Amino acid sequence: MRKVTVIRPQKLHFPFSKGKILIDSIECETVKAGKSAEIEIPDGGHDIQVIFAAAPPVNSNMLRIEQSDGDTVFEVKIVVPLKNDPTYAELTKK
């Protein structure tokens, strides 16, 4: 497992400040603009999909992910599942 920091860029505006981000089935709190939250992801996790299980953002965009040591920085696309998509229901039930 690698610990990474999720950073929400200031330019992104989301209609909510609470919720969950599911990253390879690992949850972390949704990050407010300009703030960060640490999560752990499996090794080889560069194929991560970020899925908002709460209210989806207005526009899909990218989140910047960097390792806690600051060496590796990569971006992942936010995938917004449709609420009538069975995948959405599967991901959001806890």
Q: What is the role of each PLM region?
A:
Residues 1-94:
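Short loop/turn and low-complexity linker motifs enriched in small/turn-promoting residues
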